[in-house]
Amino acid sequence: MVSAGRSTCFALALGVGLAWTLNVAAQDSASRVDSPPMMSQTFDRIIAGGMVYDGSGAAGEVLDVGIRGDRITAIGDLSAAPTREIIDARGLAVVPGFIDIHSHAVRVERETSGLFNHPESENYLRQGVTTAIGGPDGNSWYPIETLLTAVEETPIGINFGTFVGHNTVRAEVMGREQRAPTADELESMVGLVDTAMREGAYGLSSGLKYIPGAYADTDEVIALSRAAAAHDGIYITHLRDEGPGLLDSIRETIAIGEGAGLPVQVTHHKAMGVSMWGKSEEALALLDDANARGIDATSDQYPYTASSTGISVLFPDWSLEGDRAERQARMNDPEQRSRILAGIVDTLREVRTGNDLTRVVLADCAWDRSLNGLTLKGLLERFDEPVTLESAAERVLWLETSGGCSAVYHTMDEGDVERIMRHPGTMIASDGGIFQPGPEVPHPRNYGAFARVLGVYVRERGVLDFPTAIHKMSRMPADRMGMSDRGRLAVGAYADIAVLDPERVVDRATFEDPHQMSEGVVHVLVNGEMALRDGELTEVRAGRVLRSTDRVATRP
């Protein structure tokens, strides 16, 4: 409940020191100063009586949070302080707004970008997310400044920053050619990354599974990562192979971090394919060993056993070189077509389905949405075709040449999801975007990733405790990107805050019915303004563009 107009009911009993002082180096200590010098101020808002979790991973404490303008200006007992508005948080948790370090809020095509089509970002706000970082998987806008200016001109409901994509940079210089760059081309790509970092990118992302990034060798990525490192950026990667080549791909990521001298992050960390189930233990051990050797290596994940991407991921890399006409000619050539089909069968068997064609579900075929929601098995049955991997490969090729589709792939094991989640070097990210209900059948992570962690993995299963989960969704990603004034509840930090019911917060989106908003988040403030009030979306869009060049402090 929110009450306003009680400007005389509080008299300030705090000062500069009445707050939680966060120890950045330790990342997990918080303290209060109980006898500060007095300093009078009137607050715009006080969040009163909630269990406050500062984002460090420390236990919560019943405190009040005072806000003036866009900043937190006091934390403590503010029961006598003057304020224009009181937000009653008794019985609720008060936490930093969550930061999605892997977001598809903006896509390369503006017309399909949720942030521009649905700038209020309701599906994020209802999970407690106040900041999204775009440009993942090697794909971003270029120039970066063009994107950030466009976002600034679109009042948005959440904060937004971006990485610069390796695939984007490579395509700018080399198109979709499957070869190594010349010295001049490599220099041009390095220059593009340098410019993007100067324009505010937070680092370099790669998608070495996708075209044209898959055509790059490790040395190329190291060279571009050095340009990001020069501006205190990070390297975040969709691994070259998340299936049978998982461990070698993590070794490559570590080598990039070592060679370029920058922090690295394995994004949407998973072990994909039945033959790889359980391999997360070895994957995490590789990251632990890297950290022990002084290489800063972390990961993020979404809390599901299914992934989602375009069906072109089923094709051999070599078959996707060049423009659409070149790819179509390749598929029309009998010899090359046979090789392509064999490659699709191998990928379906070894990584994406085993021999179970219900594991692949079509999410969006924009050219024929009657196909949305069908499994590959169901697709074959619709056309009265044999339910075999070979028939499925033929249909996949037909889907791609007809216009392409995105799909959901049920390829992971719950044991790996939980093991990766527990690891202290793992933070939470959605790999989702901004949606409103529509004809697509997207991955439920778009609507539920962060709420699912709290509802399922904290409350129901006990995989994480509540303070640790909050840390993995707020301060941990903030620190990863050098944001010393977001992702935490501290005096001087921006007032990006979620107030939620820890006993009710839960995801409602399912794979069968994904367009369902999460529940249990009561209030959300973005830069001190109410974006969600008493569970209802406001018309206020107080989100801001975040640039790495505006960081107050570098990464700890």
Predicted regions, residues:
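Bacterial N-terminal signal peptides
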Residues: 9-23
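Acidic, glycine-enriched loop/beta-strand segments at the rims
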Residues: 36-37, 52-64, 404-417, 461-470, ...
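Histidine-rich, glycine-flanked metal-binding segment
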Residues: 38-46, 52-97
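Divalent metal-coordination and catalytic microenvironments
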Residues: 50, 65, 70, 91, ...
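Divalent-metal coordination cores built from histidine and acidic residues
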Residues: 89-94, 98-206, 225-226, 291, ...
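Active-site neighborhoods of metal-dependent hydrolases
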Residues: 163-164, 172-183, 187-211, 225, ...
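Divalent metal-binding pocket/active-site signature
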Residues: 195-253
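C-terminal cap of metal-dependent C-N hydrolases
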Residues: 418-425, 430-431, 498-544
